Amino acid sequence: MQLVYPLTTERLVIRALSPDDVDRHHALFSDPDVVRYLYFGPFDRPAAQEHLARRSILDLPGEGGWINFGVEVKGEGILVGELAMGFISATHAHYEVGYVFDPAYAGRGYAAEGTAMIVELAFSGLGAHRVSGRLDARNDPSARVLEKLGMRREAHFIENEYVKGEWTDELVYAILAPEWRTLRGPATEFEFRK
């Protein structure tokens, strides 16, 4: 099943990634500040091309899989960030979200605005019961994004992951479908095709 694109918010266009995004994708994932708290990167151009090819999948994921989205500011026509949504568990109707944005576009609320749309997709379009986000505990801006969405911090794991040569703490945030509906009002309708 595929989502019909684009999705739009007040200021953003959320669309499928494509091989044409390679220059912007490389710029994002080669920036040490962008990848500081990610499990991977920075990437050289060939690694960025390979990474983008794996992320340019249109089908919604099965359990354990992820789908990635490109984000543009309306009227600008360039990739300014990427969103990700993982299908964690069918049994528990659990999805996870993630996001990466160009630092030149930081502080404008784009990460929260775009992520809100994919959280809405998980709940209204895909029937999620729970949506979560995980992050390096040092990544305060990322924590603020999830807090703006109404997610609560549910866990702080101490040195639970060994990433890029160091033990790191991880925070887990989450929100349930009834909580989301209370915050956001009526469900959004999404269009899908087979």
Segments predicted by a language model, with ranges:
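Short histidine
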Residues: 135, 142, 154, 169
